[in-house]
Regions:
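A detector for small-residue-rich transmembrane helices and their helix-helix packing motifs
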Residues: 1-190
Length: 190
């Protein structure tokens, strides 16, 4: 009855799995510290440049999430898209995409929104969405799927930003998508 073939669990996308684990730990820390860890490390907001934690927050904000629903929403997309991207571009390049997205979205929030604390991986999600639609990109060709994804996702965020008032940072989604698109274009030869 047994064919002798055994299945094993593989650690197929270490960056994506590590990122996801850090996000889960950040949410747990937030609950254990009653949100103090979010204020210290896992959200970015206008603060003194003399405060060393300000610089950690430019990256740390992507790990913090307001609640379990926020975390699950972001990690679902990251765990669906991330392994494919990590396989195509490699772990180092995917870390670069994540860190670049964190820094750019953190700086945009820091500079332009003095009274807003930003947290969550949605900028990374949008970077992954647009980057994944660029995986078939060849020099001097733009995939139709990229155009459709850009119009649907970025257009939707522009619409939401103009007409819907909520606690979602559509600008972070747009900036994350732009980072993913630009890095996808630059890395098209891989």
């Amino acid at each position: 009855m047994s064919s002798g073939k055994k299945f094993k669990i593989v650690f197929n996308a270490p960056v994506v799995l590590g990122f996801s684990a850090i996000c889960c730990i950040a949410l747990l820390l937030s609950r254990l510290t009653l949100g103090v860890s979010d204020k210290l490390i896992f959200s970015v907001y206008r603060s003194s440049l003399a405060d060393i934690l300000t610089y950690f927050r430019f990256i740390g904000h992507i790990f913090g999430h307001a609640n379990l629903e926020h975390l699950v929403g972001n990690l679902t997309m990251i765990l669906v898209l991330g392994p494919m991207l990590e396989e195509k571009y490699g772990s180092k390049d995917l870390i670069f995409v994540i860190v670049a997205t964190a820094i750019v979205t953190g700086l945009v929030n820091f500079i332009f929104f003095s009274n807003v604390a930003l947290m969550g991986a949605s900028g990374v999600v949008f970077a992954f969405i647009l980057l994944s639609s660029m995986t078939g990109f060849r020099s001097r060709e733009i995939p139709m799927t990229f155009i459709i994804v850009a119009v649907v996702y970025l257009g939707g965020q522009i619409y939401d930003g103009l007409f819907i008032k909520d606690n979602v940072s559509q600008l972070t989604h747009i900036v994350g998508g732009l980072v993913g698109s630009i890095l996808g274009y630059i890395g098209a030869d891989k």
